[in-house]
């Protein structure tokens, strides 16, 4: 009887284990003044970005990154995407599900 209880408990734990996402595609290109990366996982998550070093070698040197990331809500199946720019003005995300500040 104890064996059956332990077996059922272990089986329940194995079935309840969350599925881990695997990387299905990964591409990157890194150069001294620009870079890009593209990653996609088996659960529908993807991340893409491109960056460039602006004004390299000067006092005004800054990285400018354009990118996006997407994920799928496990419970609802809804797909979310954020696109963004990150530069000397900060991180500026946009997405259909994000609130928009009113125009002053």
From Swiss-Prot:
Residues 32-102 form the Chitin-binding type R&R domain. GO terms for cellular component: chitin-based extracellular matrix; extracellular region. Residues 1-18 form the signal peptide. Keywords: Cuticle, Signal. It holds the Pfam family Chitin_bind_4. GO terms for molecular function: structural constituent of chitin-based larval cuticle. One of its GO terms (biological process) is larval chitin-based cuticle development. Component of the cuticle of the larva. This is Larval cuticle protein 65Ab1. The gene is Lcp65Ab1.
């Amino acid at each position: 009887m104890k064996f059956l209880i332990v077996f059922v408990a272990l089986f329940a734990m194995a079935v309840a284990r969350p599925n881990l996402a695997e990387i299905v595609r990964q591409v990157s290109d890194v150069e001294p003044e620009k870079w890009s990366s593209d990653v996609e996982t088996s659960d529908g998550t993807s991340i893409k970005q491109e960056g460039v070093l602006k004004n390299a070698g000067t006092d005004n040197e800054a990285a400018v990154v354009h990118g996006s990331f997407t994920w799928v809500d496990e419970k609802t199946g809804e797909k979310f995407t954020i696109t963004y720019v990150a530069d000397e003005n900060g991180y500026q995300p946009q997405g259909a599900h994000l609130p928009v500040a009113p125009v002053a």
